[in-house]
Amino acid sequence: MPEETFEFTASRWTRGNLLFPVRIEVSRERVARIKPRLVGANEESIPISKVASVNITTGLIWAEIRIDSSGGSNPILSHGHRKADARRIRDLIEGFQTGR
């Protein structure tokens, strides 16, 4: 049975996302930030069980999301997401952590 993955793409109208917008992927197992490049991609991920907090900072239109791990490693940072998408990312992570 394939794992269900939710994907959220940052707006191309925000800094650093014009050609290759950042994607946040959330699944039952992990949350990942994927930054495509001309050749390949840069991916960082945190297991859902190790997510300590999700912080959302909203602006007029866009939101920035910060996902901290309980292991003390570098947080996942992403900007340029719609506010509704940022809240959905937080709700999915919290839901997967509680088993919903």
Q: Positions of the model-derived regions?
A:
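Acidic, Ser/Thr- and proline-rich intrinsically disordered linker/docking segments
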Residues: M1-L18, V26, A32-R33, G40-R100
